[in-house]
UniProtKB/Swiss-Prot annotation:
Pfam families the record matches: RuvC
Quaternary context: Homodimer which binds Holliday junction (HJ) DNA. The HJ becomes 2-fold symmetrical on binding to RuvC with unstacked arms; it has a different conformation from HJ DNA in complex with RuvA. In the full resolvosome a probable DNA-RuvA(4)-RuvB(12)-RuvC(2) complex forms which resolves the HJ.
GO cellular component, one term: cytoplasm
Cellular compartment(s): Cytoplasm
Binding site residues for Mg(2+) 1: 7, 138
UniProt keyword annotation of Membrane present: no
Family from the record: Belongs to the RuvC family.
Name by which UniProt lists this protein: Crossover junction endodeoxyribonuclease RuvC
EC number: 3.1.21.10
NCBIfam families documented for this protein: ruvC
Cofactor details (free text): Binds 2 Mg(2+) ion per subunit.
Catalytic residues (UniProt): 7, 66, 138
Binding locations of Mg(2+) 2: 66
Length: 165
Protein backbone atom coordinates (compact mmCIF):
# COMPACT_ATOMS: atom_id res chain seq x y z
CA UNK A 1 0.00 0.00 0.00
CA UNK A 2 1.31 3.44 -0.91
CA UNK A 3 0.58 6.26 1.56
CA UNK A 4 0.81 10.01 0.99
CA UNK A 5 1.39 12.04 4.14
CA UNK A 6 0.69 15.78 4.20
CA UNK A 7 1.87 18.39 6.70
CA UNK A 8 -0.38 21.34 5.82
CA UNK A 9 0.87 24.90 5.62
CA UNK A 10 0.01 27.94 3.55
CA UNK A 11 3.57 29.09 2.85
CA UNK A 12 5.15 25.61 2.85
CA UNK A 13 3.22 22.33 2.69
CA UNK A 14 5.25 19.19 3.26
CA UNK A 15 4.48 15.88 1.58
CA UNK A 16 5.93 12.40 1.80
CA UNK A 17 5.13 9.10 0.12
CA UNK A 18 5.94 5.74 1.69
CA UNK A 19 5.30 2.15 0.67
CA UNK A 20 3.95 -0.36 3.20
CA UNK A 21 4.37 -4.08 2.58
CA UNK A 22 3.23 -6.00 5.60
CA UNK A 23 5.16 -4.53 8.52
CA UNK A 24 7.93 -3.14 6.28
CA UNK A 25 8.01 0.54 5.36
CA UNK A 26 10.10 2.14 2.65
CA UNK A 27 10.60 5.68 1.43
CA UNK A 28 9.29 6.55 -2.05
CA UNK A 29 9.61 10.35 -2.25
CA UNK A 30 9.17 13.57 -0.31
CA UNK A 31 9.12 17.27 -0.98
CA UNK A 32 7.68 20.70 -0.35
CA UNK A 33 4.92 22.68 -2.02
CA UNK A 34 5.46 26.44 -1.82
CA UNK A 35 2.99 29.28 -2.27
CA UNK A 36 4.05 32.92 -2.25
CA UNK A 37 2.37 36.20 -2.98
CA UNK A 38 -0.41 38.33 -1.60
CA UNK A 39 -3.48 36.81 -3.25
CA UNK A 40 -4.83 34.07 -0.97
CA UNK A 41 -6.92 32.46 -3.70
CA UNK A 42 -3.92 32.14 -6.01
CA UNK A 43 -1.81 30.67 -3.21
CA UNK A 44 -4.45 28.06 -2.38
CA UNK A 45 -4.85 27.20 -6.08
CA UNK A 46 -1.08 26.79 -6.36
CA UNK A 47 -1.07 24.34 -3.43
CA UNK A 48 -3.95 22.41 -4.99
CA UNK A 49 -2.15 22.11 -8.33
CA UNK A 50 1.09 20.99 -6.69
CA UNK A 51 -0.68 18.31 -4.63
CA UNK A 52 -2.43 17.08 -7.80
CA UNK A 53 1.00 16.69 -9.44
CA UNK A 54 2.28 14.64 -6.48
CA UNK A 55 -0.80 12.39 -6.59
CA UNK A 56 -0.51 11.89 -10.35
CA UNK A 57 3.20 11.06 -10.16
CA UNK A 58 3.22 8.74 -7.13
CA UNK A 59 -0.29 7.22 -7.26
CA UNK A 60 -0.95 6.73 -3.52
CA UNK A 61 -3.63 4.30 -2.30
CA UNK A 62 -4.36 6.24 0.90
CA UNK A 63 -3.47 9.56 2.46
CA UNK A 64 -2.93 11.01 5.91
CA UNK A 65 -2.94 14.60 7.11
CA UNK A 66 -2.15 16.34 10.36
CA UNK A 67 -5.06 17.79 12.31
CA UNK A 68 -5.08 21.52 12.93
CA UNK A 69 -4.35 22.76 16.40
CA UNK A 70 -5.64 26.13 17.55
CA UNK A 71 -3.03 28.49 18.95
CA UNK A 72 -2.99 32.11 20.12
CA UNK A 73 -2.59 33.44 16.57
CA UNK A 74 -6.15 33.19 15.27
CA UNK A 75 -5.29 34.57 11.82
CA UNK A 76 -2.44 32.07 11.46
CA UNK A 77 -4.68 29.20 12.54
CA UNK A 78 -7.30 30.27 9.99
CA UNK A 79 -4.73 30.34 7.16
CA UNK A 80 -3.46 26.91 8.19
CA UNK A 81 -7.05 25.65 8.17
CA UNK A 82 -7.57 27.00 4.67
CA UNK A 83 -4.45 25.24 3.38
CA UNK A 84 -5.56 22.05 5.14
CA UNK A 85 -9.02 22.37 3.57
CA UNK A 86 -7.50 22.64 0.10
CA UNK A 87 -5.37 19.55 0.78
CA UNK A 88 -8.41 17.58 2.02
CA UNK A 89 -10.44 18.67 -1.02
CA UNK A 90 -7.65 17.62 -3.38
CA UNK A 91 -7.35 14.21 -1.69
CA UNK A 92 -11.14 13.74 -1.84
CA UNK A 93 -11.18 14.65 -5.55
CA UNK A 94 -8.57 11.94 -6.11
CA UNK A 95 -10.79 9.43 -4.27
CA UNK A 96 -8.23 8.75 -1.56
CA UNK A 97 -9.26 7.56 1.91
CA UNK A 98 -7.74 9.99 4.42
CA UNK A 99 -6.61 9.44 8.00
CA UNK A 100 -6.32 12.48 10.26
CA UNK A 101 -3.88 12.52 13.18
CA UNK A 102 -3.10 14.94 16.00
CA UNK A 103 0.48 16.24 16.02
CA UNK A 104 1.17 14.65 19.43
CA UNK A 105 -0.04 11.25 18.22
CA UNK A 106 2.26 11.43 15.18
CA UNK A 107 5.26 12.33 17.34
CA UNK A 108 4.45 9.64 19.92
CA UNK A 109 4.17 7.03 17.15
CA UNK A 110 7.41 7.96 15.40
CA UNK A 111 9.61 9.21 18.25
CA UNK A 112 7.99 7.67 21.34
CA UNK A 113 7.07 10.96 23.03
CA UNK A 114 4.27 13.33 22.12
CA UNK A 115 6.22 16.55 22.57
CA UNK A 116 9.28 15.68 20.47
CA UNK A 117 11.41 18.35 18.83
CA UNK A 118 11.70 18.71 15.04
CA UNK A 119 15.24 17.29 15.08
CA UNK A 120 14.03 14.16 16.89
CA UNK A 121 11.28 13.62 14.29
CA UNK A 122 13.76 14.02 11.41
CA UNK A 123 16.20 11.58 13.07
CA UNK A 124 13.55 8.91 13.68
CA UNK A 125 12.08 9.26 10.17
CA UNK A 126 15.57 8.61 8.75
CA UNK A 127 15.95 5.56 11.02
CA UNK A 128 12.55 4.10 10.08
CA UNK A 129 12.97 4.83 6.36
CA UNK A 130 16.59 3.91 5.50
CA UNK A 131 18.06 6.01 2.71
CA UNK A 132 15.50 8.76 3.19
CA UNK A 133 16.74 12.35 3.05
CA UNK A 134 13.84 14.66 3.95
CA UNK A 135 13.83 17.89 1.94
CA UNK A 136 13.07 19.92 5.05
CA UNK A 137 11.35 19.70 8.42
CA UNK A 138 7.88 19.93 6.82
CA UNK A 139 8.67 17.01 4.49
CA UNK A 140 9.96 14.99 7.48
CA UNK A 141 6.73 15.77 9.34
CA UNK A 142 4.72 14.58 6.31
CA UNK A 143 6.68 11.32 6.24
CA UNK A 144 6.03 10.93 9.99
CA UNK A 145 2.31 11.42 9.35
CA UNK A 146 2.43 8.71 6.66
CA UNK A 147 4.27 6.38 9.07
CA UNK A 148 1.62 7.04 11.73
CA UNK A 149 -1.07 6.15 9.20
CA UNK A 150 0.76 2.93 8.31
CA UNK A 151 0.50 1.90 11.98
CA UNK A 152 -3.03 3.11 12.68
CA UNK A 153 -4.75 3.48 9.30
CA UNK A 154 -5.97 -0.10 8.91
CA UNK A 155 -7.29 -0.23 12.47
CA UNK A 156 -8.96 3.16 12.01
CA UNK A 157 -10.68 2.06 8.80
CA UNK A 158 -11.83 -1.15 10.49
CA UNK A 159 -13.24 0.68 13.51
CA UNK A 160 -15.07 3.15 11.24
CA UNK A 161 -16.64 0.23 9.38
CA UNK A 162 -17.69 -1.34 12.69
CA UNK A 163 -19.32 1.92 13.83
CA UNK A 164 -21.32 2.14 10.59
CA UNK A 165 -22.49 -1.49 10.79
Amino acid sequence: MRILGIDPGLRTLGWGVIEQRGSRLSHVANGLCHSDGDDLGERLLSLHNQIVEVIEEYRPDQAAIEQTFVNKDGAGTLKLGQARGVALLTLAQAGLPVGEYAPNRVKKTVVGVGHAEKEQVIHMVKLQLPGCLPKGADAADALAIAICHAYYGSAQALSQREVRA
